[in-house]
Amino acid sequence: LKANTSPVTNTFKAATSEIKIEEKTDDGIKSEIYVKNEGTATSYVRVKLVCNWVDKDGNVSATPVPAPTITNSDWFEKDGIYYYTKPVGPKDSTANLLKDPITQPNAPEGCHLEVTVLAESIQAAPSKAVTDSWGVRVDNNGYLTQPTTTP
């Protein structure tokens, strides 16, 4: 018996978790915010909104800006960060983060509201990595949930 084999090249390509923030504005006011999964791995997404009053010279005002209220049931807030509850497949997008356009009354004189959207994604599998990295749970349906605290 004689075994004769030639080398076989196995090509493996790692999955990627890449996202793109998509915003729509209405008269310069952010009215819709989505996050699109441009990677190859199903991923979870979280977003932080940084709101500042900015004057005509680009200086940030010391006046605090309250965070906008998010009431979309596909998102939940934990420590100022909004988590999309559903895993986002490749080339898919989250639901709109905003229920209403972001507006803030009572701007300091000479200032306008500037909203910066910061987003982050993490590969959905293994779910333990999501829990360890972000401190949120993945339920039996694959949805993100806030961790429960017991007194």
Model-identified regions with their sequence ranges:
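Long, small/polar-residue-biased beta-strand-and-loop interaction regions
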Residues: 1-151
